[in-house]
Amino acid sequence: MTDPSAHSAALTYGSYLALDELLSAQRPRSEEHDELLFIVVHQVYELWFKQVVHELAYLQERLHRGEGGHALATLKRVLTILKTVVSQVDVIETMTPRQFTAFRSRLEAASGFQSAQFRVLEAMLGRRDERMLAPYPPGGPGHARIAAAMAAPSLFDSLLRYLATQGFAVPPVPEAPAAGWRPPSEAVQRVLLDVYRADGEAALVCERFVDLDEGVQEWRYRHVKMVERTIGDKPGTGGSAGAQYLRTTLFTPAFPDLWAVRGAL
């Protein structure tokens, strides 16, 4: 005999996606119509950041195994997600400065500056900066995840490891400074020139890394322009300098060696 309770517990679209929890996670703090859009857009960003971090961790595994084909497929997915992330700025820009100002005070000290997932992404890209930990209580999940990402090999470390599996003589590379990104290395650039001149799969992987770097920089640019058009030069809600701070993050490549070799090709 079939247990009647089995039907009530059967998996559904809603239960599989946890839609009851997901759709109840938007809790505006004002009666302003536009606050819901603000919340939804930022929650969607966080979901995409989660997926990008997930894919980049998988990418590192493939690179460590020397699996260039799998790495290229994963990079294609990440790049497609980044294009979606950038395009979502168009949605938030339908909100006028007046519409945002109407509920901005209700955000109190909450700020995108506090996005732990984006800090993890930055750490995976190679940023090593203990100041990134400041907004997160020691012992908390955000603090632990960012610290672990900064202690782990960066994406560029994984790329160099992959190149070594392909027979290229990868030299030791300098460590990133205590507050910043790893400096360029002429020794690494000589190896990258060999990679590009061989014009094989490894060169394609390097090119997709350039696309990744460019995609993140494009996101940063669209983000700062969105902030400028919404709040001008006002300070950020979390105490940051707002657009002024965001401008300082522009045009800093995560993989400077891949850019430096282009003039010598």
UniProtKB/Swiss-Prot annotation:
User: Which family does the similarity line name?
Assistant: Belongs to the tryptophan 2,3-dioxygenase family.
Query: Which SUPFAM superfamilies does the UniProt record give?
Result: Indolic compounds 2,3-dioxygenase-like (SSF140959)
One Pfam family from the record = Trp_dioxygenase
Q: Which organism is it from?
A: Anaeromyxobacter sp. (strain K)
Q: What is the lineage of its organism?
A: Bacteria, Pseudomonadati, Myxococcota, Myxococcia, Myxococcales
Query: Which cofactor(s) does the record list?
Result: heme
* Functional note: Heme-dependent dioxygenase that catalyzes the oxidative cleavage of the L-tryptophan (L-Trp) pyrrole ring and converts L-tryptophan to N-formyl-L-kynurenine. Catalyzes the oxidative cleavage of the indole moiety.
According to UniProt, the reaction catalysed is:
L-tryptophan + O2 = N-formyl-L-kynurenine
- Protein name, UniProt field: Tryptophan 2,3-dioxygenase
Q: Establish whether keyword Hydrolase is in the entry.
A: no
- Record text on subunit structure and interactions: Homotetramer.
Q: Which EC number(s) does the record attach to this protein?
A: 1.13.11.11
State any GO BP term from the record: L-tryptophan catabolic process to kynurenine
Q: Could you tell me the keywords of this UniProt record?
A: Dioxygenase, Heme, Iron, Metal-binding, Oxidoreductase, Tryptophan catabolism
Q: Which GO terms describe its molecular function?
A: heme binding; metal ion binding; tryptophan 2,3-dioxygenase activity
